[in-house]
Amino acid sequence: MATPSPLRALVPDHEIRFNAVLDHWTGVGDFHAAGYRQATELLLQRFLADPEGTAGERDSLVLPILFLFRHYLELRFKDIIVYGQVLSGQPARWRHGHDLESLWTEVQELCNAVYGSSVSAEFVKVGECVTDLCQLDPNSTSFRYPRDTNGCPIFEHLVIGLKALNATVASIGDCLDDISMDMSVRVHDQP
């Protein structure tokens, strides 16, 4: 009887189409942020495409979806901050920590320095979304764990509208991705 091989999750497949590649260029913040946004949207679109067939999954997967979206915002903010620092003549420093409110404050300051007062209505909605998310998950733990550090349940009853969440992810994601792309181009066009 042959011994079973150990389960190995991180080995390449012999068929290239079943492999994902992480390379030196994946160290740029945009790559990570884009992946978290895409994962958020794929899960939401799955539920919206088949609301009857995914009823039980919606409740069990909404927390990972919210975590993915929150983490997208965190990574995109950090990405914009680095570009904004360079464009403002500051040294580029990648921020650590998960405080969306302080990251958002810095994004606003740097966007005002780069663009002046010409911010879109969507940009204002980002701040409203950050406020909502931070009320539910101020430290990036509430969407990941069932209980807080005192052992108390984090959510007793919360209803999340998936259509509204999907529209928010798309709208805010487009706004932030556009800012990141514009700043990236400006940084790369500098002499």
Regions found by a protein language model. Give the residues of each.
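Domain-scale activation on soluble regions of proteins
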Residues: 1-191
